[in-house]
């Protein structure tokens, strides 16, 4: 009976998944139900939750991941400074920093020749390190304290110390703006902008149609879905949210960065970009220590991922192959200058796009928009779930069927779009300034020539004395940048190693999983079979011996017979 029970038990072991079942269903269900961090599926809170797992900085709020996988959000304090000259600070002592969870609004004030922040203290708390341990006790992000008397005014500096965070408040915002300003100065020093003479500005072109960069992002996303999930992309809608884009960031496990030198001057520099980190748990981090220098650029520490390893960086570095550096306050950078300090991880960007299946009814503008009528919620599918990336990070080999090169292209497209947008806005400002100077100069000259007639307006009998020329400089700049982007793509494609990977990798990766499984079975299978056969033979020999001994009686020895 015992041997039969063991045989049945061994047979049933084949039917047990032992926890290695495909987690795609569970991961996709969590992704669909709770959404992205900045969606705030868990609602709003007035205080940072004490049991939070991690936190992500969003535009105007901070999202906290709870143990039930919901994201709860807390609004950051608002600046209520009155217009006009700053008032005197109502404080006798000034602190270096105050955490943003200890007040709901703040103002700017002046004391002497310096500007400070002031607010009413709602609670007191001691400062300390963040809840997320990055590696060791010396690499934690320090949180600001809340010292003072509850209900009274407090004042603090407008610049936070190095590696000190106020929880997404005005100090963190000032730090991000300072980093952006310094990166723009570095970019202008490396790449001087093309200047037009005021009298040689290109003439007006035709009006621009739909933004070409948005169409490129949608086309790249469609091609990526076509390679990974053909059944979904056959009939679906790709939906982009209105408002400022917040791309998704997924881990990049390859340390794809290069040290910038004089020979490598083609590093793409973009302004700091706010992103939503997804699927980060353990990552390889890049660390640059602080030397207490006034010229340091504090990028902060990552607060959404643990660091399994840390690489010390001492010089300027550039992200390559469409990757970005993700640092404190989940801000993305493509270039880290010489004097940067902080803790960052490498990531790849994906657009914040939702997918609607073709059989899902999509509402169109109708009378419902004017007369309220409850409408059924649309079932959106997040892009990460549609691509199978969520399961790929869990199983490791499940998502190998999607080509890595396609993710690189899509991330590269997003980075280029941000750089183009920044350059275009700068050109718009320069155009307005140059046109204003030309108009004023010409106006003065014409007024002098027609002074006897009362000026140029009275001489021409015009009702409107000002005219702004709509120049085509912005359109020419966009065209030039698009040509430059195409040139860089051709340079990347001319690399034999990258071209070889792009041509063979998508076809080899789908067979890699079954091939590794077959090799594993051929290597370990004979050993397991031999052990199982030996075990069964031993049990059969024992049973055979027991059956034979039942037909005989044991003979008594001479001593037992005498007794």
Curated annotation (Swiss-Prot):
Protein name: Envelope glycoprotein
Annotated coiled-coil segments of the chain: 401-451, 461-497
Domain free text: The 17 amino acids long immunosuppressive region is present in many retroviral envelope proteins. Synthetic peptides derived from this relatively conserved sequence inhibit immune function in vitro and in vivo.
Record text on subunit structure and interactions: The mature envelope protein (Env) consists of a trimer of SU-TM heterodimers attached by a labile interchain disulfide bond.
Extracellular topology ranges: 19-503
Stretches for region Immunosuppression: 440-456
Membrane-crossing segments per the record: 504-524
Side of membrane Cytoplasmic, spans: 525-563
Assigned keywords, A-Z: Cleavage on pair of basic residues, Coiled coil, Disulfide bond, Fusion of virus membrane with host cell membrane, Fusion of virus membrane with host membrane, Glycoprotein, Host cell membrane, Host membrane, Host-virus interaction, Lipoprotein, Membrane, Palmitate, Signal, Transmembrane, Transmembrane helix, Viral attachment to host cell, Viral envelope protein, Viral penetration into host cytoplasm, Virion, Virus entry into host cell
UniProt xrefs under InterPro entries: TLV/ENV_coat_polyprotein
Positions where lipid (S-palmitoyl cysteine) attaches: 527
Motif (YXXL motif): 552-555
Residue ranges annotated as motif CX6CC: 457-465
Keyword Heme assigned: no
Site note Cleavage, residues: 376-377, 546-547
